[in-house]
Amino acid sequence: MLPGTFFEVLKNEGVVAIATQGEDGPHLVNTWNSYLKVLDGNRIVVPVGGMHKTEANVARDERVLMTLGSRKVAGRNGPGTGFLIRGSAAFRTDGPEFEAIARFKWARAALVITVVSAEQTL
């Protein structure tokens, strides 16, 4: 489901934004492209150090939006491209998803995003 260009973006460092819906409106957190791991072609695993509000939001509403990009990957209109990922999320503290981010010793959990759609934005 995720296109090859998405994987090219992951090879270059950049900021990732993850949006959830909270009781008081949207909530955003950030991480890095290099922290993301893709499993089975449609699950993105993110190591979690904090993200307590994100976790509470996901417990109420599993829908998430994620954006990421890189200036170093050619886009449709020139240098730089990005993606908008829509998906459902869950937090895992054990199992294969958590093991996938074991190199991050500070991670208390894994945020697992099952991709519903991936749209190239640039």
UniProtKB/Swiss-Prot annotation:
- The keyword Flavoprotein appears for this protein: yes
- The main location class comes to cytoplasm
| Top-level taxon of origin | Bacteria
SUPFAM superfamilies per record? FMN-binding split barrel
Q: Which cofactor does it need?
A: FMN
Q: Does the keyword RNA-binding apply?
A: no
Q: Where in the cell is it found?
A: Cytoplasm
Which of UniProt's keywords are assigned here?
A: Cytoplasm, Electron transport, Flavoprotein, FMN, Transport
Pfam families (UniProt xref): PNPOx_N
The UniProt entry's GO CC annotations, sorted and at most eight, read: cytoplasm
What is the purpose of this protein?
Functions as a redox protein with a potential of -325 mV.
The entry describes its oligomerization and partners as: Monomer and homodimer.
Annotated protein name in UniProt: FMN-binding protein
